[in-house]
Amino acid sequence: MTDSTLYLIKAFFLGIIEGLTEFIPVSSTGHLILIGDWINFTSSSGKVFEVVIQFGSILAVMWIFRARLWQLIRGTLTGVPAETAFTRNLLLAFLPAAVVGAIFIKTIKQVFYHPGVVAVTLVLGGLIMLWVERKTHHTPGDAPGAADDTASDERASAHTLEQISWKQALGVGVAQCLAMVPGTSRSGATIIGGMIAGIQRKTATEFSFFLAMPTMLGAATYDLYRNIDLLSQHDLSAIAVGFAAAFISALVVVRAVLRFVANHTYRGFAWYRIALGIVVAAWLMTK
């Protein structure tokens, strides 16, 4: 196998990882950092590669929600109250990360983009998810672990996207800022932040998907603009392969997640995060 073929295989594999992990609460950036290190994926345009495969993921979610997205745009432009309120909530949720990212993202990447940080945030994020799921379902008189995974979130005040208040949307936006630290997970921070704010789990997941559109498009476009000079002709084929792999795998995952959260909690993802964080920590100690 030639070096160029192996390089394309690695790019394809990382694209799959991006698509599989971007919209579940396990941290796509954390996985890309860890797996890229494990498989020794080196690219002169590594930053551009990561940005472009994120474009693949976000285009997948835009394609899946294309009808609802068009309804939202048309309703906002024509002054439909429910759609206008939803757009306002998306903007409110988008702004905190946009401001914090514009000011601190360079420092955050320099300080926190390390496997050790990923290990810690994976475990902490998993523990927080377990706590929130228990808090959401546990009611007085229940035995520990007695909550039914298929139960609705009784304490939630917002069960549809239209019921989300501006305060809840802003709370989700503040939570999204935490996702700038690798290993935290953008989807995890926004979904769990939404649940803490009183949004029902499935609705919080859907809101997270819609919030991903302006957030990821804005961040990816900005990163691409800043790092476009790093792009080389040699890496174009790998970037194209990674983009396609991320798009296709994200199509599968987003549909699967929407079906999953209708009848399940996020506890399984929480335990996965904790286990992976421990494995990564053990691996780092042996290096």
From Swiss-Prot:
Its EC number is 3.6.1.27. It is an enzyme of class 3 (hydrolase). Keywords: Antibiotic resistance, Cell inner membrane, Cell membrane, Cell shape, Cell wall biogenesis/degradation, Hydrolase, Membrane, Peptidoglycan synthesis, Transmembrane, Transmembrane helix. GO terms for cellular component: plasma membrane. It is a multi-pass membrane protein. It is found in: Cell inner membrane. Pfam families: BacA (PF02673). Catalyzes the dephosphorylation of undecaprenyl diphosphate (UPP). Confers resistance to bacitracin. This is Undecaprenyl-diphosphatase. It comes from Bordetella petrii (strain ATCC BAA-461 / DSM 12804 / CCUG 43448).
